[in-house]
């Protein structure tokens, strides 16, 4: 029987001060025995302590673990803390939520996603990004049973993070082109519904760039809802294909090259300009949309060298070689990479 499982959150809560309802929400979901709260060193004071207080007000037993990084060691360490009857609440950015996903999946318990930023679509997807000694890889996990997104907290986070989330969403445009290309040339499985949802998510950002401003609760709410729909596209597809193509392999190549990589969404945004040019698409529209939401559009704005861009472009096809993209099996030459980056203004 050709059966496929599509995981989605049971409930999603988005709004100002919703964090103070954490205990009631977990109680309603019958996650009221014991909760392991995972958070970061900065997000404890910003958000986690309020969630913990709300849980304790509902007489829910709470353990707390500060997560410093995403690695197999940190996931294993958290997994060992999950005892019978314990569920997981991930409070923070992408790293914390990825550890929550992986550890809860390992122990087959529920987890609740509580993002404090809206910097990428991992807040709801069933996949997690985890670093190994060479690069970041996508690991299978499970979707959260619920998402609690306090739009006031997210609006008060650095605008650069929200801008990066917008750039990550805009990158769906080239991700879908790559997926369609792989479907035509390699007969790769393709989902029209997942692709349509992914493109709709990207258009929600490009159609509303003038509404995305620093400190606005409405801006945070819009981006979170759009990241949610993009994450749902990933769930429907059963892979990250709807939101990850050649622009993401460019970003992952930069991760390998740079001692201190830029934000994931920022790198993907610049990659989208480059890959849209290769497709003969409207790369200027991509560039202008990124500028409108405050995202970088050049090596200089990313704070990296021209050589870093060229190296990443020529290396990108070696990242996830099983995933066919516009870069093909053999990639592009150094001369072609230079011309591409120069013509799009990514380098000067």
Swiss-Prot record:
GO annotation terms (biological process): glycerophospholipid metabolic process; phospholipid biosynthetic process
Record pathway: Membrane lipid metabolism; glycerophospholipid metabolism
Cofactor binding remark: Binds 1 zinc ion per subunit.
Entry's EC annotation: 1.1.1.261
Chain residues that bind NAD(+): 94-98, 116-119, 125
Gene3D superfamilies: 3.40.50.1970, Dehydroquinate synthase-like - alpha domain
Keyword Lipid metabolism annotated: yes
Binding site for Zn(2+): 168, 248, 264
CDD domains given in the database record: Gro1PDH (cd08173)
Protein's UniProt keywords contain NADP: yes
InterPro entries listed in its UniProt record: G1P_dehydrogenase_arc, G1PDH, Glycerol_DH
Binding site for substrate: 121, 168, 252
Cofactor(s) required, per the database record: Zn(2+)
Subcellular location: Cytoplasm
Domain of life: Archaea
MF (Gene Ontology): glycerol-1-phosphate dehydrogenase (NAD+) activity; glycerol-1-phosphate dehydrogenase (NADP+) activity; metal ion binding
GO cellular component: cytoplasm
Catalytic reaction annotation: sn-glycerol 1-phosphate + NAD(+) = dihydroxyacetone phosphate + NADH + H(+); sn-glycerol 1-phosphate + NADP(+) = dihydroxyacetone phosphate + NADPH + H(+)
Protein keywords: Cytoplasm, Lipid biosynthesis, Lipid metabolism, Metal-binding, NAD, NADP, Oxidoreductase, Phospholipid biosynthesis, Phospholipid metabolism, Zinc
Similarity-based family: Belongs to the glycerol-1-phosphate dehydrogenase family.
PANTHER family per the UniProt record, alphabetical: GLYCEROL DEHYDROGENASE (PTHR43616), GLYCEROL DEHYDROGENASE 1 (PTHR43616:SF5)
HAMAP family, sorted: G1P_dehydrogenase_A (MF_00497_A)
Described function: Catalyzes the NAD(P)H-dependent reduction of dihydroxyacetonephosphate (DHAP or glycerone phosphate) to glycerol 1-phosphate (G1P). The G1P thus generated is used as the glycerophosphate backbone of phospholipids in the cellular membranes of Archaea.
Quaternary structure note: Homooctamer.
Protein name according to UniProt: Glycerol-1-phosphate dehydrogenase [NAD(P)+]
Organism: Methanobrevibacter smithii (strain ATCC 35061 / DSM 861 / OCM 144 / PS)
Source taxonomy: Archaea, Methanobacteriati, Methanobacteriota, Methanomada group, Methanobacteria
